[in-house]
Design a protein with these regions (language model features):
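Charge-dense, intrinsically disordered terminal/linker segments
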Residues: 1-97
Length: 97
């Protein structure tokens, strides 16, 4: 009999999905973008994340799109961040699009 686990091949993400704190989730998203070779526009990140909505309560999601640059040149792509508030932790979904 074939085990179900051997048939399922889920993609391994380049960042940790579950975090104990909201700050940890945001820092992981920033590290993900930097690992891919992009530089984050700190002014844009501060305005949207730091001055934006408070951390999500249970069952709510905060979404952000942050400007990126590569080799000093602003890119059309953006870092998409979604942080979902769970009971005692936060779920991170981040990608570059």
């Amino acid at each position: 009999m074939i085990k179900l686990a051997s048939l399922i091949k889920e993609a391994k993400s380049d960042y940790e999905v579950y975090h104990k704190s909201y700050t940890s989730a945001i820092e992981a998203a920033r590290a993900y973008a930097e690992k891919k070779g992009y530089e984050i526009n700190n002014d844009d990140a501060f305005t949207k994340i730091g001055m934006g909505p408070r951390k999500p309560s249970e069952g709510k999601t905060n979404r952000f799109d942050i400007e990126l640059s590569k080799d000093g040149k602003v890119q059309r792509k953006k870092l998409q961040i979604q942080v979902y508030g769970m009971k005692n932790s936060y779920e991170l979904n981040a990608y570059i699009q």
